[in-house]
Amino acid sequence: MDFLNDHINVFGLIAALVILVLTIYESSSLIKEMRDSKSQGELVENGHLIDGIGEFANNVPVGWIASFMCTIVWAFWYFFFGYPLNSFSQIGQYNEEVKAHNQKFEAKWKHLGQKELVDMGQGIFLVHCSQCHGITAEGLHGSAQNLVRWGKEEGIMDTIKHGSKGMDYLAGEMPAMELDEKDAKAIASYVMAELSSVKKTKNPQLIDKGKELFESMGCTGCHGNDGKGLQENQVFAADLTAYGTENFLRNILTHGKKGNIGHMPSFKYKNFSDLQVKALLNLSNR
């Protein structure tokens, strides 16, 4: 009986019962009248008369007029003061319900370990992401982004090699950079170890060289020396300090991406909780 906890459901149930009772009463009254009453009244002059059945010159029933006027008043209240044009919306109600559910969800699963987070992320990925990225997250032979590299140094190297677009930054599209694999790896190591909040790299010996290349190849022109991508307090380019973090992943899930391969739609309507985003990130970083 959980549906009775919603006042709209209760109102609808009461209204349905009232309508049912009135329908039964009115139907029984009409049936009785049809059985016992006799036709009487003055026929309309020049009115319809077919097989002896004519049209009486009776006034419109008061009850019908009252019902009609009440319907007009109710419709005016409903549209302008009650729901649609005032405050209520189905999308808003849905978002509130999802928000409440997410709070219960996070409270229930807030103490998950690493393995459980990966398992949760795997379930979310298979339902929402695998159709394009494949069940192995490798991108279905190039038809979508390879997420096995995402959030890691390999992902940065891939961006350096192919460029990036579709995030609608003021800087515009990032062009591909003509660097060999060793130099790209050095920049990726520097970004992961010094700029990103991840603060670790598989190639610490390349950090210094990566910093030199980051500055000399013009990366600071868009991303800034600190990698935050801000110019005059405006978001000019991608924030590299968030790369490989929950904020970076949520930004893509929220806005989608029109990349070199195809168009990833926004998943904002899914209202993923912070825990679900964390689970997806743990799956990606495993």
Swiss-Prot record:
Cofactor: heme c
Annotated Gene3D superfamilies: 6.10.280.130, Cytochrome c-like domain
Sites where the protein binds heme c 1: C129, C132, H133, M264
Pathway: Energy metabolism; oxidative phosphorylation
List of residues binding heme c 2: M174, C219, C222, H223
Cofactor binding, per record: Binds 2 heme C groups per subunit.
Superkingdom to which the source organism belongs: Bacteria
Protein's cellular compartments: Cell inner membrane
Disulphide-bridged cysteine pairs: none
Gene Ontology cellular component list: plasma membrane
Bilayer topology: Multi-pass membrane protein
This protein's UniProt keywords: Cell inner membrane, Cell membrane, Electron transport, Heme, Hydrogen ion transport, Ion transport, Iron, Membrane, Metal-binding, Oxidoreductase, Repeat, Respiratory chain, Transmembrane, Transmembrane helix, Transport
TM annotation in the entry: 11-31, 62-82
KW Oxidoreductase (keyword) present: yes
GO molecular function, one term: cytochrome-c oxidase activity
GO biological process: oxidative phosphorylation
Location of the Cytochrome c domain: 116-195, 205-286
Family of the protein in this entry: Belongs to the CcoP / FixP family.
Complex and partners: Component of the cbb3-type cytochrome c oxidase at least composed of CcoN, CcoO, CcoQ and CcoP.
Function: C-type cytochrome. Part of the cbb3-type cytochrome c oxidase complex. CcoP subunit is required for transferring electrons from donor cytochrome c via its heme groups to CcoO subunit. From there, electrons are shuttled to the catalytic binuclear center of CcoN subunit where oxygen reduction takes place. The complex also functions as a proton pump.
Protein name (database record): Cbb3-type cytochrome c oxidase subunit CcoP
Taxonomic source organism: Helicobacter pylori (strain ATCC 700392 / 26695) (Campylobacter pylori)
Lineage summary: Bacteria, Pseudomonadati, Campylobacterota, Epsilonproteobacteria, Campylobacterales
